[in-house]
Design a protein with these regions (language model features):
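PEST-like low-complexity, intrinsically disordered acidic/proline/serine-rich tracts
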Residues: 2-260
Length: 260
């Protein structure tokens, strides 16, 4: 069954088939989720030397899968580390219901969450764009022209991002988030004090390691790091997927926020 025919399936199929693969930190060769690709096993990520742009920087462009938390952000913590969440926010998290997940209601995932659909990186000299197939076909723009964060930001789903290169790693600094999105299916929270620093390193032609430092003194006792791996999807293109056209099943989701 190809992707175009799967897009019309109910959200239940999408969620149920996806998380087992997408929530893993480093899926070896992920099976495409319903609504986002053929159910046949995806080809192995290509190997070989990393390509470069004419300006000498690493070429990060292409269609990728994964690279961030889906089911549980703790999957990205280092072995033995625990989430430094404040007790009052743990109570809020424990009370959350799956039906209230903004992502399940066709709203953006925010940062650093990924939905279980492909996404694309586009690079220019002045901007890097992240284009997302899932939900509302949203995008992030990362300013690469040396500007600073404005002092009067209105809170938004993806915040305000500025990028720079440290050797072969793209470093993305983001502030100005709203507090409306969840970090994952289980409702891990944040506040408008959230500040993220993402480090994108293309270790091979088909592998992109994304390390994110999360600093949110409103909800956590200290900054912490998560690491996830995205795999290149050679030959893939992003499809038009309008979540609002196919979201009738969300009204049947019940119970506490959890991994499906």
């Amino acid at each position: 069954m190809n992707r175009s025919s799967l897009v019309a399936l109910p959200l239940a199929l999408a969620v149920g088939a996806l998380v087992a693969v997408s929530a893993q930190q480093t899926p070896p060769a992920p099976t495409s989720p319903a609504g986002a690709g053929s159910q046949q096993r995806a080809p192995a990520a290509p190997t070989g030397p990393v390509k470069r742009l004419p300006n000498g920087h690493v070429d990060l462009s292409g269609v990728w899968q994964g690279g961030g938390p889906v089911g549980d952000i703790k999957m990205g913590l280092a072995k033995g580390e625990t989430l430094p969440i404040k007790p009052e926010w743990q109570k809020i998290m424990d009370a959350r219901q799956s039906k209230d997940d903004p992502e399940a209601n066709c709203l953006p995932t925010g940062v650093p969450r990924r939905d279980p659909y492909p996404w694309r990186i586009l690079q220019t000299d002045t901007h890097t764009f992240l284009l997302f197939e899932g939900n509302i076909h949203s995008y992030r723009q990362i300013f690469m022209d040396g500007r600073k964060h404005p002092s009067d930001l209105d809170p938004t789903w993806y915040g305000h991002s500025v990028g720079r290169w440290e050797g072969d790693t793209l470093v993305v600094d983001t502030v100005g988030f709203n507090d409306l999105f969840w970090f994952d299916f289980i409702g891990t929270p944040h506040t408008e004090q959230l500040h993220t620093v993402e480090r994108y390193t293309r270790t091979t032609l088909g592998t992109l390691v994304i390390e994110t430092t999360i600093d949110d003194p409103g909800a956590y006792t200290r900054p912490f790091k998560i690491t996830f791996t995205a795999r290149l999807r050679p030959g893939e293109e992003l499809m038009e997927y309008i979540c609002n056209e196919n979201n009738g099943f969300v009204h049947h989701i019940t119970g506490p926020a959890k991994e499906f």
